[in-house]
Amino acid sequence: MGKGCKVVVCGLLSVGKTAILEQLLYGNHTIGMEDCETMEDVYMASVETDRGVKEQLHLYDTRGLQEGVELPKHYFSFADGFVLVYSVNNLESFQRVELLKKEIDKFKDKKEVAIVVLGNKIDLSEQRQVDAEVAQQWAKSEKVRLWEVTVTDRKTLIEPFTLLASKLSQPQSKSSFPLPGRKNKGNSNSEN
């Protein structure tokens, strides 16, 4: 099991961040339940990666963002990964996800950071404001994976979190510094 990765789940108010986590982890979200504003919760999850390794995730369920309110900066400094959530029936929520991605890039200084994007509430397709193709094109241009999901179908939630855990548990790339006792490649030592 890995060291435990910190994942920040963020998006506008009422896009379903808490519902996604509750359904994914406990399978107990009730559709039509009245929204309660989240201050901040931390969920612990053990997620199996695509390599069969279990990765411990600390999922930070953030307070829903509102107009003019930014994600507190401390999240950018400690997060190993992000889940950006928008609602397919709320264009403003998608636009906020676009801004959040830019903020992550700025604060992480373009360092490799695991990000997945979830377009929630696909069961409300008759109220759709975010075109699926436009969202996928944006995700492709930003080099992030995007899934459209619904808390009414728990299976739609599993793959994004499996991929995220897999990205977070990838072995560190090899050091570019020579290790003691090893010869450098391309450095022939003819004096021996």
Swiss-Prot record:
Residue span of region Interactions with NFKBIA and NFKBIB: 58-93
Single GO term (MF): GTPase activating protein binding
Subcellular location: Cytoplasm
Residues where GTP binds: 11-18, 61-65, 120-123
Pfam families assigned to the protein according to its UniProt record, in alphabetical order: Ras
Record note on quaternary structure: Interacts with both NF-kappa-B inhibitor alpha (NFKBIA) and beta (NFKBIB) in vitro. However, it probably only interacts with NFKBIB in vivo. Forms a complex with NFKBIB and NF-kappa-B heterodimer (p50/NFKB1 and p65/RELA). Also interacts with c-Rel (REL).
Protein name per UniProt: NF-kappa-B inhibitor-interacting Ras-like protein 1
Organism whose genome encodes this protein: Homo sapiens (Human)
Gene coding for it: NKIRAS1
